[in-house]
Amino acid sequence: MKSTFGLLALAAAAKLVSAHATVHAVWINDVDQGAGNSADGYIRSPPNNSPITDVTSTDMTCNVNGKNPVAKTLSVKAGDKVTFEWHHDTRSDSDDIIASSHMGPVMVYMAPTEKGTAGNGWVKIAEEGYSNGKWAVANLIANRGKHSITVPDVPAGEYLLRPEIIALHEGNRQGGAQFYMECVQVKVTSAGTKTLPAGVSIPGAYKATDPGVLFDMYNSFTSYPIPGPAVWDGSSSGSSGSSGSSPATTTAPAVSVTAAPTKEAPVDTSATPTTFVTATKPATTAAPAAPSASSGSNSGSDSCNSGSASGSVKIYGQCGGQNYSGPTSCEAGLICKEWNPYYHQCVSA
């Protein structure tokens, strides 16, 4: 019996590892800049796709090895559209980007290269959380791993762009949230006049007990408080201190599409990337209480639970689990997947 349990645990652990993600490439004004996740690329990439779970670790800045510059730096101008492309394994049509259980917010920070490398001066320039019953990560998966920002009108110089995912599938326990991030090296060539605010320190922007970090996505909720500072409005230079769970609404500058010379790499371009134009922090609601027993490893098994509740659950909605009393039937084309004993989710068949 112990042997069987051990094998199941190893299988679950292997599945979790395969579900992780890193940034593989960047597009500028819809032009592919080629793979950037190597020592001779433009992304300060970690040695593997494992998440950071300790919010006090210096690896929170740019991930493991993130203090080490890489060979290339991308040239951008104010108003350029920069698209980040995430994958869990390869830049292929078959890549699943990240596990559909790893729901959570997607954010982007920016800092001058020297300050950012030291963990200081980080300004949030985009965010997407939970809206209309759908997580930002769900949109990321649907868009084949792509999400976009607009380069603000900052002074010329070298900067780091820091895209980030927070996966909350284990966020119902302290230290369970998984952080994925890399730093992309860019050089702004336009002479902007909007100096970045002082920004926040990373590590330091998040606490393990922040409502958007310690968050139980397995119980009923209607909104989600995106952690960290408010999104910079692109013009003010005031404090960018941590806003925690306070509501804030900001609008990013409009996108100006101007082609940049580059070498294109073959990659699927059929999906339209998500562009963060308006980033909204909804009013805070208290995070639901975590289950009395800690959730187990991701089993990934299909669930055929039945219950008395009626109605069909939409994609990525909960459809089962211990102490769950809601609808258990998924909409057509979906199956009810058991991620752990406490949470079953409707996903594509």
UniProtKB/Swiss-Prot annotation:
One of its GO terms (cellular component) is extracellular region. Keywords: Carbohydrate metabolism, Cellulose degradation, Copper, Disulfide bond, Glycoprotein, Metal-binding, Monooxygenase, Oxidoreductase, Polysaccharide degradation, Secreted, Signal. Its EC number is 1.14.99.56. Glycans are attached at N323. InterPro entries: AA9 (IPR049892), AA9_LPMO (IPR005103), CBD_sf (IPR035971), Cellulose-bd_dom_fun (IPR000254). O2 binds at H169. It is found in: Secreted. Its main location: secreted. Residues 233-304 are annotated as: Disordered. Disulfide bonds join C62-C183, C319-C336, C330-C346. Residues 1-19 form the signal peptide. It catalyses: [(1->4)-beta-D-glucosyl]n+m + reduced acceptor + O2 = 4-dehydro-beta-D-glucosyl-[(1->4)-beta-D-glucosyl]n-1 + [(1->4)-beta-D-glucosyl]m + acceptor + H2O. Has a modular structure: an endo-beta-1,4-glucanase catalytic module at the N-terminus, a linker rich in serines and threonines, and a C-terminal carbohydrate-binding module (CBM). The CBM domain is essential for binding to and subsequent oxidative degradation of polysaccharide substrate. This is AA9 family lytic polysaccharide monooxygenase C.
